[in-house]
C-alpha cells in the first residue's frame, strides 16, 4: 500500500510538472 501511495505521488508530481524525465530521476532515488 505504501508503494502505491509513493507511485501515485510521483505520478501527480510528474503530471503537475509535465516533465517525463522527472519520473526517471525519482525512480533512481527510490
Swiss-Prot record:
The protein's enzyme class: hydrolase
Superkingdom classification of source: Bacteria
Summary of temperature dependence: Highly thermostable.
Enzyme Commission number: 3.4.11.-
Cofactor needs: a divalent metal cation
Entry keywords, A to Z: Aminopeptidase, Hydrolase, Metalloprotease, Protease
Complex formation: 12 chains of two different but homologous types, alpha and beta, which can combine in various ratios.
Stated family: Belongs to the peptidase M42 family.
Designated name of the protein: Thermophilic aminopeptidase 1 alpha chain
Amino acid at each position: 500500500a505504501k508503494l502505491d501511495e509513493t507511485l501515485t505521488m510521483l505520478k501527480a508530481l510528474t503530471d503537475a510538472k509535465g516533465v517525463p524525465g522527472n519520473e526517471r530521476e525519482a525512480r533512481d532515488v527510490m
